[in-house]
Amino acid sequence: MKVLENLVYTKTHEWVRFEDETTALVGLTDYAQQTLGQLVFVNLPQEGDETVTGESFADVESVKAVSDVYCPVTGVVSEINEELLDAPEKINDTPYEAWFAKITDITEKEEFLSPEEYEEFVKKEME
């Protein structure tokens, strides 16, 4: 399982890369994609959609199941990664480059885990 130092993480296995205080990219962690298995479909939010911290804003379908992806910030979707619509396997291949959406006008943030805290959280979850 790969965890990058320049990101923060959630207990629902999303990663967040802040570009500044009110703009962030959101994606699924390496652990999440490994657990889900080969992804075959992704449903992304629409540009202009409002997001709410802790609520589902996308979903992914693997050969095993359909899973919600939760937004760790409240804001507005300013851009989606359209490449994922045609190639959801990019989430499996390069999870930390395969961002789902850019969220701007962020007004609320989830309590995030540092890379070290996330690694510990996953270890406990795997026990």
Swiss-Prot record:
Modified residues (N6-lipoyllysine): K64
GO-annotated cellular components: cytosol; glycine cleavage complex
Keyword annotations: Lipoyl
Bilayer-spanning residue ranges: none
Cofactor: (R)-lipoate
InterPro entries, alphabetized: Biotin_lipoyl, GCV_H, GCV_H/Fam206, GCV_H_sub, Single_hybrid_motif
Disulfide bonds: none
GO annotation terms (biological process): glycine decarboxylation via glycine cleavage system
Lipoyl-binding domain segment(s): 23-104
Cofactor, free-text remark: Binds 1 lipoyl cofactor covalently.
Quaternary state and interactors: The glycine cleavage system is composed of four proteins: P, T, L and H.
Its job: The glycine cleavage system catalyzes the degradation of glycine. The H protein shuttles the methylamine group of glycine from the P protein to the T protein.
Recorded family membership: Belongs to the GcvH family.
Protein name: Glycine cleavage system H protein
Organism name: Lachnoclostridium phytofermentans (strain ATCC 700394 / DSM 18823 / ISDg) (Clostridium phytofermentans)
